[in-house]
């Protein structure tokens, strides 16, 4: 009860949803993000949050993704894909943290 539910139809939770409006109305400036899949929906949402000026933290051990082939067709493990997504944008769009840091506050 009292929670805002924001259904989404694209990979970013900000596209064609009222999420940004809700956050701004509530004066929320810092986001802590977790979810599936790191290299798709999570990354798209966090990129957009950064572009919109939110102070964004991605909880690395509260996200996961799936194995997939790279551009050359070599299969990359889910851990490799996850790690590359984290490394690509850490410090640019988000700050990577873990659940222990979240719980410490």
Model segments located where?
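Active-site-adjacent betaalpha module
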Residues: 1-105
């Amino acid at each position: 009860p009292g929670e805002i539910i924001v259904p989404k139809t694209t990979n970013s939770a900000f596209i064609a949803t009222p999420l940004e409006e809700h956050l701004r109305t509530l004066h929320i400036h810092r986001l802590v993000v977790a979810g599936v899949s790191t290299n798709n929906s999570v990354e798209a949402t966090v990129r957009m949050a950064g572009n919109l000026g939110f102070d964004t933290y991605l909880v690395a051990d509260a996200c996961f993704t799936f194995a997939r082939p790279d551009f050359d067709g070599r299969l990359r493990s889910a851990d490799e894909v996850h790690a590359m997504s984290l490394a690509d944008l850490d410090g640019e769009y988000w700050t990577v943290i873990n659940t222990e840091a979240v719980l410490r506050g």
